[in-house]
Amino acid sequence: MFKTFYDNNDAITATGLCQIQDTRYLVQNPPNLPLSQKELDEIHDLTYERDVHPYYRTGGPTKAIETIRFSIASHRGCYGECNFCSIAVHQGRNVVSRSESSILKEALAITKLVGFRGYISDVGGPTANMYMIECEQKKEKGSCKNKRCLYPKACENLPLNHGPQIELLNKIAGIEGVKKVFVASGIRYDMVMEDKKRGLKYLENIVKNHISGQMKIAPEHATPQVLKAMGKPGTEYLKKFKNEFNKLNNNETDEYSRQYLTYYIIAAHPGCTFKDMLDLKEFARKELKITPEQVQVFTPLPSTYSALMYHTGIESFTGKEIFVEKDPIKRDSQKAVILGRDHYRRPTKHDYGDKKRLRR
């Protein structure tokens, strides 16, 4: 049933879904078609306040607004299709990019805003480096039913070319009043490594000009069975990307400041055992030479394959049973494997209620 729902969220091929409920039918209409580039440009050309609603100002400063006040959305949609992420359902698997002229117009407008000090905090989207990279076949016929764009590796029909984003960032940086343009959105390192023509040039440009000390990437895990359950690529791409990143950071010229990789990790995802977290810690120590700090305990989000696996204990694509850690203390313990013993916590009455242990 879930696969029927998920496949039916492609706007180009979707039809109405009907489910009988008592004497009536529940009807889910197909999603709207993706916005055209012209429509997306028109939406972003509107004069937004770039501030919190006046109602919330009475409660004092809102710190979160400062991270996005001077940022630019370059595109929407994501074809990464990580099993734990609902963006593919919310925004669609078709990436729609704004025109260069629209983005440059917004960047120029930002320079005129009160409080702007020359720094554009982010130019990106759900995945920063999907800008202007989309499959022409998918635009016409919709997403493939039994094939993903990036998993287990990039599809040959995906025209990987980071050139347009390189040019865009350079042009924004050249606008009078702009001191620095940052890319703070996450980057798919597998796309960088699969772009044989401009991938390394893109990485060099980002490291040299567009990150403020840390580049965010999301390997999420390292063991094959957990990565498979997540719909994430293997560690080969990660190791190659890290090596290229390190080469740039070992450059002794003044062009490069010392930069670091920030790794996002998920603990207690369906299929992940305590031993898997120990293996991940060892991988991070030996291969990444770091202890990741951005670790979160898996949260099952609606409309995702990972939530389906969490609640059913069944691997979504094979129908086989899969281990799911539901004990709240043990879930936190998986996170603590990476972060250290200070992050272990004692159980509270809210964890178990009247039960001694939650049942799987």
Predicted regions: what they are:
Residues 1-68, 349, 355, 359:
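Flexible, acidic/Gly-rich N-terminal and inter-domain linker regions that tether
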Residues 43, 78, 82, 103, ...:
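Conserved, mostly hydrophobic/aromatic
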Residues 43, 134-163, 229-230, 234-236, ...:
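Radical SAM enzyme [4Fe-4S]-AdoMet core and its adjacent flexible, acidic
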Residues 57-86, 104, 119:
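N-terminal pre-triad scaffold of radical SAM enzymes
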Residues 85-102:
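Iron-sulfur (Fe-S) cluster-binding segments and ferredoxin-like electron-carrier domains
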Residues 97-98, 344-355:
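Structured C-terminal cap/extension of enzyme domains
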Residues 109-262, 267-270:
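Conserved SAM/AdoMet-binding glycine-rich loop
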Residues 269-286:
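Catalytic cores of alpha/beta
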